[in-house]
Amino acid sequence: MKGYAEEKGVTLCMEITNSKVAADQRTDQVFDRLAWGLGVCRAVNSPRVKLVYDVYHVQIADGDVTRNLRENIDRVCHIHVAGVPSRQEIDGTQELNYPFIARTIADLGFTGFVAHEHRPGPGRDPVKSLEQCFEIMNV
């Protein structure tokens, strides 16, 4: 696959998830630790094989979200964000400081996509919730 991706100029993106939360739903999980995915990237040694850096999953499985991002940004093709622990909004009701994470991403010069896995909390207006998430990430 590496050769084909390189020939066609496409990037294969592997998403790291975690096997701690809802482990019964992830019985076939392969990429459940950041180190494992980074090891695959190093072993394959191609600029066309990278990681989807899912902030929610990295926090649950490994922690050190911004340090890990800084140390491995060259292996990241796409970033997912979601609140921890709820997997909902990325606002102040969650344990992560998303304005700081957003500034870190910008400071690293990341030019890929950052996607919010948007799932409003109970009773939240979906549009207002999404607007708030955009304001948080727009640095």
Where are these regions (language model features)?
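Internal active-site segments that recognize and position negatively charged phosphoryl groups
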Residues: 1
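Histidine-acidic metal/acid-base catalytic patches
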Residues: 7, 31-53, 57-139
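Active-site-proximal beta-alpha loop/turn segments in soluble metabolic enzymes
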Residues: 16-27
